[in-house]
A protein has these predicted regions:
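A conserved ligand/cofactor-binding region detector
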Residues: 1-171
Length: 171
């Protein structure tokens, strides 16, 4: 994360390592592979426990890349935007005022929907459900334009990895 500071009457962003991740971020051991053309990254699923209704426990799922390299951060929140194998999840909203930044944002968005789709299918299979009955067991709420990529991503996974026909995947 980063914090805002003022130096010489200018606002700057600096790294802010405010808490040790191990105290609240639980590594689940679940990993997925995400391909970006000829590049591949391995994601790691972390959970944050969230107390729910009547002391129930909910999980907030967070995906990170296995090979994140925080040393790429140079000054403030400036970093090499093209080394996605090392920087994909360094910052939530990287500067996208140039082509490299725009591409990094698209990679981040695809990374999240690809992992989310893989996690949904993994959990459905673990519960013993047939993936052909997916709509009976899963509802996906899409709150923005970028997460809509989950629709073609689910179709891609179902057709290329699960053996569905295109018509079956769309249904």
């Amino acid at each position: 994360l980063f914090k805002q500071v003022f130096k010489d009457h200018l606002q700057n962003a600096e790294k802010n390592d405010w808490i040790q991740k191990d105290s609240w971020l639980n590594n689940t051991g679940t990993k997925f592979e995400v391909a970006f053309g000829d590049r591949k990254v391995t994601s790691v699923l972390y959970d944050i426990d969230v107390v729910g209704y009547e002391n129930g426990l909910n999980k907030l799922h967070l995906f990170d890349i296995e090979t994140v390299d925080e040393s790429l951060v140079k000054k403030g929140i400036t970093f090499d935007k093209e080394a996605i194998e090392k920087n994909l999840t360094l910052f939530l909203y990287p500067d996208d005022s140039d082509e490299a930044g725009n591409l990094l944002r698209i990679y981040q968005e695809y990374f999240m929907v690809c992992n989310g789709a893989q996690l949904i299918l993994k959990e459905v299979k673990e519960k013993g459900y047939d993936l052909h009955t997916l709509p009976e067991h899963v509802a996906i709420q899409i709150n923005d334009t970028h997460p809509t990529m989950v629709i073609p991503e689910l179709i891609r996974i179902l057709t290329t990895e699960e053996g569905f026909t295109m018509d079956e995947a769309i249904d």
